[in-house]
Amino acid sequence: MLQSMSGADDRKRALTGTVEDGPRKRLHSDEATSKSAATPTNDNEDDEALHPAYAGLEAFRKEAIYRKLLEARRDLQRIERRAGTFQDDLAVSEQRAAVLQRFWNLLLTELAARLAIQDQDVFALSSASDSRSDLTAMEQQLEQQSSAVLRCLSQQGDVNIVELQQKLHDLADEGSRYKQDLFLTQSKLQRAQDALAQTSQKLSKVEHEYVRYQSNLLRATEGKPTIPAGTIVSASEPAPATEQTADTAVKKETATLAPTDGAPHTSETLQKAVDELESARQDVELTRRESDSRYAEIQTLNEEVRTLKCKLHETQTKLTTLPEEVLLSSALYRELQTLLRNAQQDLQSSKEAMQALETEATALREDRAAFQQTVEAEAASRSEDLEKLIKAKEADVTRLRSQRDELNAELTERRSREQVKFTQIEEMKALLNSKEERLILLSSQVRRLRMAVAAFHGQSAGVSALATAESEEDQFEQVSRAAQQAQARVAELEQRLGVAGQNASPNGTGATAKTEKGADVDTKAEKSVEAASESELQGEIQRLRLSLQAAEASSKAVDDELEKISAAYADLERQASVKVTDVSRMEEKALRWVTEKSKADNKYFSAMRAKDAVDAELRTAKQVHERQQKTIEAFADVERNYVVQSGLHEKAISTFKKVTDAQTHRIETLQRELELAESRLTELARVKEVASDSAKELINTANLEKDQRKRAEERIVRLEKDLESSKRQLAKAAASAAKNKGRRDADAGDGASEKDFLNALLQCSSCKERYRNRILTKCYHTFCSECIDSRVQTRQRKCPHCALAFAVSDVQPLYLQ
């Protein structure tokens, strides 16, 4: 360091400025140093060394070397304290290792004596070996010893594997909890050690700044007021001789610049810095003591864990190697003997029951075979009957369908024929109506002709009758009345003749009378011939009159019948037009029939296609029938399966009977077990009392350990808070000590703010006191273990930040590397 400083002095240039320019960055020397530096031994030395600016360089170098020596002495004191702590820890570790070695040797000796291990040389080497022997050899020896012990233990009696596995899992869980607690404690210890290292580093910086603060030479160089003469300097501060040598030139240069009232302010600042330094040292010492006590507690807990593991191993060894007398006198052995006797009795009864069941099973098999044959024969006959019935039903259905089609066709044909008949009847009605009218006309014409004939013959009565009669019925009535009148007149004449004959004589008188009468008739005839010519003329006149009368009546009748003739002609004309219309309609019908024929052809082809489809459906129906037949067969199989299941159910019933018998036997067994359990209960009550006493002791011990652990955690938290306060005090002290260095103060302020920010990030956001050591895998928010445990215990399992519900399995430890 001195050589580098001297090399730097050789490369420096001389100052050309005057003293009136104010304080410079370069160092100013006094007159004494200038005189001592003014006698060079080298002839080639230039005049730069004789310049006043380099006069105080030697004093500055000496003071810097002295400050480095003080810093080295402080570091040496710290190292000696740490070495003493390490030596104490080493002594404690050696003592614990010796105790553990003695315990291990005693344990191996006891195991060798109890288990009668053949290879005694392996355990002899353990006691004869040196504690400072090779670590590899010790590991090999321990491995040999453990393998020998395991072989001997494996050769012993049966071990309750389930119980050992359960104990192993419990021990593994307990070990994981201890490991977790150890990791948390180690992390806290590491944080405390890091904080202690940072505090020590800051303390060394503060001490260095304090020493520089008390140097008048540096204060004069930096342009600050000097320390008063009455200030007390501690043993770690620079010697006052250096200050006296540097007072001459520096005071002269800074007299004009320093204020007159700076001494009281400087002493107060110095006293404040000294107080802060002492408080920081006390905090560091307190932190170191707390760290040592915490490490001692960790070592104590580790020792307790090892002791508990050794006790557990001894207990397991005792459980696996019980003496024969203890086994014979134990209640479990007696219970096993009782159970063995009961089991033998049960075995004998089971054999007898099994023989009876085999006989019954043979009889049941024979009955089942006979019943199966009978059921199969009945099912086959019934299935055949059902098949015949299905075929007959299908034939009936086919026949009924064909008859239905024939009847539908016949009904359609009859409807068409009835329609034709109705049409013909209408036409015949029209013809009959016209025929009646023509008959009426003909009858009227016949009546006129009769009138003409009657007039020609001179029948006035006939002419008058025909003229007055309107119809043949009237004429017939008139003729009937005239005939009746004529008959009545003839009957009257015959009656008169009979009366006249009766009055005459029966012989001559009558003939004479007839002769006379004949003569009278001849006379009358002659008279009538004469009068005949006159009567003929009168008759011709009468006949002509009658003809005229008949012609007049005929003309009147013709006039009356003219309207009827015109109406009949109109009817005939209409009927003729109807016939023409019928002909056109028939032509249209013929065309329609042709169209219908084409449609019928299409229908025929579609019917043929439908027939093909029906044939396909028939084939499908046949296939369905086959499938149904198969289904019937499957049902027959199912029926057989049901028969088998019925046999199985019968077996189940017999099994249920067996189970009932077994349950009865079980009840008897349970009664015997109840008696054994009562005897066992008395023994368990005694064991429970012993276990409850030991459990109370263990619970009290665990509560004490829990309280100690809680107090230790609280003390750790308190120490962390004290450490944070000491850090803040040290930061304030450093800030007050380096107040004149603006850039350094700014950097320190930035570092403190960054440190506070990082510390706030590491602290729990819920309590703002402890650090984060738990994470919620549900939302990945981190908190301290106390806050999470309090929410788990109170069953308010929601995240304090986002209020998301979480389970106990979602809480995991947070590892910061």
Swiss-Prot record:
GO terms for biological process: chromatin organization; protein ubiquitination. Keywords: Chromatin regulator, Coiled coil, Metal-binding, Nucleus, Transferase, Ubl conjugation pathway, Zinc, Zinc-finger. It catalyses: S-ubiquitinyl-[E2 ubiquitin-conjugating enzyme]-L-cysteine + [acceptor protein]-L-lysine = [E2 ubiquitin-conjugating enzyme]-L-cysteine + N(6)-ubiquitinyl-[acceptor protein]-L-lysine. InterPro entries: E3_ubiquit_lig_Bre1, Znf_C3HC4_RING-type, Znf_RING, Znf_RING/FYVE/PHD, Znf_RING_CS. Residues 21-33, 514-529 have a biased composition (Basic and acidic residues). Residues 160-222, 265-505, 532-579, 658-739 form a coiled coil. E3 ubiquitin-protein ligase that mediates monoubiquitination of histone H2B to form H2BK123ub1. H2BK123ub1 gives a specific tag for epigenetic transcriptional activation and is also a prerequisite for H3K4me and H3K79me formation. This is E3 ubiquitin-protein ligase BRE1. The gene is BRE1.
